[in-house]
């Protein structure tokens, strides 16, 4: 993402600005305009926001522009599979989120996903995006027990700043359940 946006590594970004700039650059790229590569804006926006929800739920604060990439194949341009995904809120040095939504959508570890969906209404219908996020949120129910079954250390599972113990309550507060 940093290379596409021509930004220096480590610079703080705002999600909505990044999304719009990426959409513009990709839609106006030679690959799309001249070669006819397919780029689904709604699918991209949905996946971007869904990945941020997953980062938040799993305590992965390391969401800088080098941890997101694109690939192109015969079906078009899309995000690569998720990589470099770990509960970085557990890092003793404290890894802050470098890409944020900004207030009033994100403040003090709380998120207003309804407002996030409205912010992106020029790219996707807010109801559609919120519905897709609700589906992802439902899949996060029971995450704590599934992670324990897979052997995630208790030190991570119980660390308050990672926040795995109260995911359903947070999802309800954020309007996703």
Predicted stretch roles:
Residues 1-65, 69-177:
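Anionic ligand-binding catalytic core segments
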């Amino acid at each position: 993402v940093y290379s596409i946006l021509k930004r220096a590594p480590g610079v703080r970004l705002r999600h909505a600005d990044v999304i719009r700039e990426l959409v513009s650059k990709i839609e106006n790229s030679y690959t799309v305009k001249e070669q006819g590569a397919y780029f689904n804006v709604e699918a991209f926006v949905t996946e971007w926001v869904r990945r941020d929800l997953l980062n938040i739920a799993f305590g992965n604060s390391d969401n800088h522009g080098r941890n997101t990439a694109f690939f192109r194949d015969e079906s078009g341009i899309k995000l690569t599979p998720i990589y470099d995904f770990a509960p970085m809120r557990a890092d003793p040095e404290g890894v802050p989120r470098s890409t944020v939504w900004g207030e009033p959508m994100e403040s003090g570890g709380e998120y207003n996903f309804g407002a996030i969906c409205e912010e992106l209404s020029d790219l996707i219908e807010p109801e559609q995006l919120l519905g897709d996020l609700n589906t992802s949120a439902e899949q996060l129910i029971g995450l704590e027990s599934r992670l324990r079954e897979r052997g995630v250390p208790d030190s991570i599972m119980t660390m308050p700043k990672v926040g795995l113990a109260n995911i359903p309550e947070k999802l309800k507060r954020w309007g996703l359940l």
